[in-house]
A protein has these predicted regions:
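ABC-family P-loop ATPase nucleotide-binding domain
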Residues: 11-14, 21-39, 247-248
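ABC family nucleotide-binding domain
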Residues: 33-241
Length: 248
């Protein structure tokens, strides 16, 4: 018996003396993110107690659990905003623990997008300029950055709001600008921490549907911390945290 891995990541079982049939194909998924035995303490408080999590490319995973379960601490480590005390983290087939702070920052800016409950848009810049910031940091020219940002804002229904500053936008519009900013470098992975927590039910529903649209159009991978049961129900998989561990 031989095993052959095709470029499409399909595992084929075959015997040289038997004709191949499609029923022998077993599709396997490439891991976009893999966390192994993640531990984190702050002083004497042990927050994460050996968390294991694997997320496939193109998957939408929500993390739920009571306040204090360790959800946001885990998201910060998965998103490389903080380092674990021990454990291994792989994103897009790269192990990150040995990267210097500078290289980790560069990796984060190119490979990862963030969406938070509060949009954190810079008030002195308009929507287009806010979306361009990560592209500028990545070294993209102003012309190319503005082209990418314009396409994203138009796709998100903000083509006529690009020159408006954050205080001239509604809450839902501000969050869509934040989504465009998260996407401008075409990241491999997007992390969201309570992304609809500051929105009314209508804007929250539109944001949740937007995540599905982005996954369909760009094969984006999402890891989302949320208390919103509607958003959790839309995801491909819901994982629950309790006392610093994933319990299901």
């Amino acid at each position: 018996m031989h095993l052959t891995l095709l470029p499409q990541f399909t595992l084929i079982n075959y015997s040289p003396n038997q004709p191949f049939t499609y029923s022998q194909q077993i599709t396997i998924f490439t891991a976009m993110l893999k966390a192994q035995s993640i531990h984190k303490s702050y002083g004497q408080l042990h927050i994460l107690k050996g968390v294991d999590l694997e997320v496939a490319k193109g998957e939408i995973v929500t993390i739920v659990g009571a306040s204090g379960a360790g959800k946001s601490s885990l998201l910060n480590i998965l998103g490389t905003l903080d380092r674990p005390d021990s454990g291994q983290l792989y994103i897009d087939n790269q192990e990150l623990s040995k990267l210097s702070n500078k290289n980790l920052s560069n990796f984060r800016n190119v490979k990862i997008g963030f969406i938070f409950q509060f949009h954190h848009l810079l008030s002195e810049f308009d929507a287009l300029e806010n979306v361009c910031i990560p592209a500028f940091i990545a070294g993209l020219s102003r012309n190319d950055s503005e082209k990418k940002a314009t396409r994203l804002l138009q796709m998100l229904g903000l083509g006529d709001r690009m020159k408006h500053k954050p205080n001239e936008l509604s809450g839902g519009e501000q969050q869509r600008v934040a989504v465009a900013r998260a996407l401008v470098n075409n990241p491999a992975l997007i992390f969201a921490d309570e992304p609809s927590g500051n929105l009314d039910s209508t804007n929250a529903r539109e944001l949740h549907e937007l995540f599905l649209q982005l996954r369909a159009e760009f094969n984006q991978t999402f890891v989302i911390v949320t208390h919103n049961e509607d958003l959790a129900a839309l995801s491909d998989r819901k994982v629950t945290m309790k006392d610093g561990l994933i319990i299901q």
